[in-house]
């Protein structure tokens, strides 16, 4: 499909720079193809679900992936800004670096603002290789848990570019940019639909007989990358690591066999569930990488309802929601959201999407 079909104009003032407080006071646009839209709040979510429905959340935890430092060992020592994007092994990460032109293979970058050091000393990273568009492979001076602790001490919250370009990260973001489910460290971007949840709404959902299950997908920075090709067929999707336990897969399959619906909280949960489902819609245990790219025409096998935020134009995520609820439906829903003052992107409001009906 042509990527310009997924374009739309978004006023700059629609981008949320802080989350709603309390989290479940965010607005929620309910989209039912063929039945229009309804303006609600996230706290209304239990009313839209039935006993036996199963919510699936992503329990990944965002690491302090934004690092600053200087190149050392040559005459000039330019400042280097790096965002970790994917762990390769116990001591190596892929990172997006600015300015990448200042680095070559073999260079050493000493990380930490103004000579700041971590508990083990300096954190040095050797440039192992350079890729396209500012991507480099770093080989760090520490390994395993020691490297993780050094990154946690020296790094900061990796805010999305549409927020970071307008303000610097601060102490509030360290908690605001984590979901209440965040457990397994490894993401460099939050699974933002989960940011809307509070203990109160979890209690209300359980009281209604809705189950809640955790899966893990370590969200990468590729989630923010625009689709630069003219046709979706030419786009190379980023891969991310995920896991679904046998216990969770069995529980979801059993609930669905009894008539319960699977409600994916976020596109990350949906992508992992769809990656793990067979042709009959049964979810299999899963551990590994997924690079699933969902566009209109995809047959959804594992997910019945999707709760998600509002996404960027021409993004793979807007393509995904258009596949789920229909392109024209989503364009109309987004036009309504913009005119009604909904807040967009990571810290913004939510949508509750129902699927496009077959033959619609």
UniProtKB/Swiss-Prot annotation:
This is S-adenosylmethionine:tRNA ribosyltransferase-isomerase. Monomer. It holds the Pfam family Queuosine_synth. GO terms for biological process: queuosine biosynthetic process; tRNA wobble guanine modification. Its EC number is 2.4.99.17. InterPro entries: QueA, QueA_dom1, QueA_dom2, QueA_sf. It comes from Nitrobacter winogradskyi (strain ATCC 25391 / DSM 10237 / CIP 104748 / NCIMB 11846 / Nb-255). Transfers and isomerizes the ribose moiety from AdoMet to the 7-aminomethyl group of 7-deazaguanine (preQ1-tRNA) to give epoxyqueuosine (oQ-tRNA).
């Amino acid at each position: 499909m042509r990527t310009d079909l997924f374009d739309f104009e978004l006023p700059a003032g629609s981008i949320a720079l802080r989350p709603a407080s309390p989290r479940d006071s965010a607005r929620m646009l309910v989209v039912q193809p063929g039945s229009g839209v309804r303006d609600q709040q996230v706290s209304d979510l239990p009313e839209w679900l039935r006993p036996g429905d199963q919510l699936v959340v992503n329990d990944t935890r965002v690491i302090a992936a934004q690092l600053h430092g200087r190149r050392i060992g040559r005459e000039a020592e330019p400042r280097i800004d790096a965002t970790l994007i994917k762990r390769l092994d116990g001591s190596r990460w892929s990172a997006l670096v600015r300015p990448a032109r200042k680095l070559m293979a073999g260079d050493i970058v000493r990380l930490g603002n103004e000579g700041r050091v971590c508990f083990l000393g300096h954190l040095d990273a050797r440039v192992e290789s350079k890729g396209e568009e500012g991507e480099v492979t770093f080989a760090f001076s520490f390994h395993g848990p020691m490297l993780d602790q050094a990154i946690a001490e020296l790094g900061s919250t990796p805010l999305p570019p549409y927020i970071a370009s307008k303000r610097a990260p601060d102490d509030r973001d360290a908690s605001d940019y984590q979901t209440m489910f965040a457990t397994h460290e490894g993401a460099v971007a939050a699974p933002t639909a989960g940011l809307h949840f509070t203990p109160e709404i979890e209690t209300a959902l359980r009281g209604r007989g809705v189950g809640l299950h955790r899966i893990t997908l370590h969200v990468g920075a590729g989630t923010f990358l625009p689709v630069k090709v003219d046709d979706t067929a030419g786009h190379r999707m980023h891969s991310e690591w995920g896991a679904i336990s046998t216990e969770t897969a069995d529980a979801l399959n059993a609930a669905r066999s009894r008539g319960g619906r699977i409600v994916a909280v976020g596109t990350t949960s949906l992508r992992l569930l769809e990656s793990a489902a067979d042709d009959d819609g049964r979810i299999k245990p899963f551990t590994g990488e997924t690079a699933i790219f969902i566009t209109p025409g995809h047959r959804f096998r594992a997910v019945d309802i999707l709760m998600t935020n509002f996404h960027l134009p021409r993004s793979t995520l807007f393509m995904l929601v258009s596949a789920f609820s229909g392109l024209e439906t989503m364009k109309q829903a987004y036009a309504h959201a913009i005119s009604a003052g909904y807040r967009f992107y990571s810290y913004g409001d939510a949508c509750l999407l129902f699927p496009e009906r077959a033959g619609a």
